[in-house]
Structures are given as structure tokens and as C-alpha cells.
């Protein structure tokens, strides 16, 4: 779904602070 897709983008292109990754539960490697 779109949510998972956004997570993939956030993981591939870290354009947000690290705390945003933790918020998404998608910290490149999880």
C-alpha cells in the first residue's frame, strides 16, 4: 500500500531526521 511505499522511500532516501525514521518504524535495515 502507499504507507509501505513511503516507508521504502524513507529508507532508501534518508531525507528526514533520524527520529522520523523511528516514528515510521522503518530505520534502514529493519
Curated annotation (Swiss-Prot):
Catalytic activity: a 1,2-diacyl-sn-glycero-3-phosphocholine + H2O = a 1-acyl-sn-glycero-3-phosphocholine + a fatty acid + H(+)
Keyword tRNA-binding: no
Organism superkingdom: Eukaryota
GO BP field: arachidonate secretion; lipid catabolic process; phospholipid metabolic process
Entry comment describing in which tissues the protein is expressed: Expressed by the venom gland.
Gene3D superfamilies, alphabetized: Phospholipase A2 domain
Cofactor binding remark: Binds 1 Ca(2+) ion.
Compartment list: Secreted
Primary location group: secreted
Cofactor: Ca(2+)
Gene Ontology terms: cellular component: extracellular region
Keyword Hydrolase: yes
MF term (GO), any: calcium ion binding
InterPro entries: PLipase_A2, PLipase_A2_dom_sf
The protein's role, per its UniProt record: Snake venom phospholipase A2 (PLA2) that shows weak anticoagulant activity. Is more catalytically active than the strong anticoagulant protein CM-IV found in this venom. Acts by inhibiting the complex composed of tissue factor (F3) and coagulation factor VIIa (F7) (TF-VIIa complex) by only enzymatic mechanism. PLA2 catalyzes the calcium-dependent hydrolysis of the 2-acyl groups in 3-sn-phosphoglycerides.
Family: Belongs to the phospholipase A2 family. Group I subfamily.
Name of this protein: Basic phospholipase A2 CM-I
Organism classification: Eukaryota, Metazoa, Chordata, Craniata, Vertebrata
Amino acid at each position: 500500500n502507499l504507507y509501505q511505499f513511503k516507508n521504502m522511500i524513507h529508507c532508501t532516501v534518508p531525507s528526514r531526521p533520524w527520529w522520523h525514521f523511528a516514528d515510521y518504524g522503518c530505520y534502514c535495515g529493519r
